[in-house]
């Protein structure tokens, strides 16, 4: 029923609905897991009773194992710092919450083991080291995303879009080749990032520029914050004396930018290109965003890629190497250079490299989360448009793209 409601293909792995957000899932509660949580809550409440009859009631079959794990946790783990609360944090965690976390972890372990046995729907196991899971909040699903966009995302991430390859696999077609180029196998991956006809027609570039515009807004905001003195380019470390409580810090957030009156942002798009000023560097290279200040002798270069998520590490290395010579030339011209190769996946999964950029720009946590959501949606909407136009793809002049035989 949930698959039908969300528009998921029948062959889609249903664990995507119930996995935690850190495992690229929707964090819905499976009834069996919710039932276990309720039993833990009931046992915890009854165990605190002062009535001997209540406390002597028979326990669940799995109670001894859970209680054994709880005792081990309290004896060896409770003093260790396993979260971001800071050393010495004494926030008391209820036993029932710890037991529920055990149940949740057991369920996630089952999902991982199940995914390892899948042939296609297990990419989420590979990208967790370098990608940030999409935060599918109810606010986003209700007010921001359309049902069609959610359906596209879930099926694209689960590799269950009705592309030519899957239609043949499901016995609904005999033609496996791409609608547009007529050469490669028509998978969703090929259509969204690998079709040469779509590349030459500018479809991928327009999606890329949609994401790049959001990043440019983040850079502009960072420059404005530096001008107003909201951020500083000097790092500071706060210390708390033993036996004292930490107080709210008034230290300004760190940013790679300093206040200067001549910060200039140049952006390379499909419709409009730029040239690096010759007094800065004589080069034909054009990073997607070129931010510079002659007064500070500072350059920040940002190169964006919108790849298939599993290709992010490889593409990141390619883009860093691409601007190696330009970085050296700028350094020889006595400029301080920061190069950021950032990635936003074609299915809306952002790479950690983008988070690192936004953090180094000195943006607040609220701003960072907002820009991550916006870049994610921009990439996803761009891919959705490509998907919708897979049989009627048009070039920039409005004419049908000729299928290559």
Predicted regions and their residues:
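Short beta-strand-loop-alpha-helix junction that forms the active-site gateway
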Residues: 286, 298, 303-318, 344-346
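Extended C-terminal regions of large enzymes
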Residues: 6-173, 177, 385
């Amino acid at each position: 029923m949930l698959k039908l409601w969300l528009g998921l293909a029948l062959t889609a792995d249903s664990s995507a609905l119930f996995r935690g957000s850190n495992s690229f899932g929707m964090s819905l509660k499976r009834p069996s897991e919710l039932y276990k949580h309720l039993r833990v809550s009931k046992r915890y409440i009854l165990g605190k009773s002062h009535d001997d009859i209540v406390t002597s009631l028979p326990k669940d079959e799995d109670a001894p194992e859970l209680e054994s794990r709880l005792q081990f946790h309290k004896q060896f783990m409770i003093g260790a710092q396993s979260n971001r609360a800071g050393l010495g944090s004494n926030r008391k965690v209820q036993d029932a919450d710890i037991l529920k976390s055990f149940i949740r972890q057991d369920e996630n372990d089952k999902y991982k083991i199940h995914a390892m046995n899948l042939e296609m729907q297990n990419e989420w196991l590979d990208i967790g080291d370098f990608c940030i899971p999409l935060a599918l909040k109810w606010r986003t699903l209700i007010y921001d995303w359309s049902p069609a966009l959610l359906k596209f995302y879930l099926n694209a991430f689960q590799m269950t879009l009705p592309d030519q390859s899957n239609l043949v696999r499901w016995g609904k077609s005999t033609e496996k080749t791409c609608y547009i180029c007529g050469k490669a196998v028509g998978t969703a991956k090929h259509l969204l990032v690998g079709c040469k006809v779509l590349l030459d027609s500018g479809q991928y570039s327009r999606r890329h520029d949609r994401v790049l515009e959001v990043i440019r807004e983040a850079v502009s905001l960072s420059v404005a914050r530096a001008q107003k003195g909201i951020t500083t380019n000097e790092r500071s470390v706060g210390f708390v004396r033993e036996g004292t409580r930490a107080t709210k810090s008034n230290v300004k957030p760190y940013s790679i930018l300093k206040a200067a009156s001549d910060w200039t942002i140049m952006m390379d798009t499909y419709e409009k290109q730029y040239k690096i000023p010759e007094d800065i560097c004589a080069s034909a290279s054009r990073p997607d965003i070129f931010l510079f200040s002659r007064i500070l002798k500072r350059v920040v270069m940002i190169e964006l890629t919108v790849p298939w998520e599993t290709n992010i590490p490889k593409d990141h290395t390619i883009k860093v190497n691409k601007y190696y010579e330009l970085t050296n030339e700028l350094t020889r011209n006595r400029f301080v250079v920061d190069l950021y190769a950032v990635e936003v996946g074609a299915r809306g999964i952002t790479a950690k490299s983008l988070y690192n950029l936004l953090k180094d720009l000195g943006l607040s946590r609220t701003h960072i989360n907002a820009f991550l959501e916006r870049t994610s949606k921009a990439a996803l909407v761009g891919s959705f448009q490509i998907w919708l136009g897979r049989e009627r793809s048009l070039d920039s002049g409005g004419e049908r793209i000729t299928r290559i035989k």
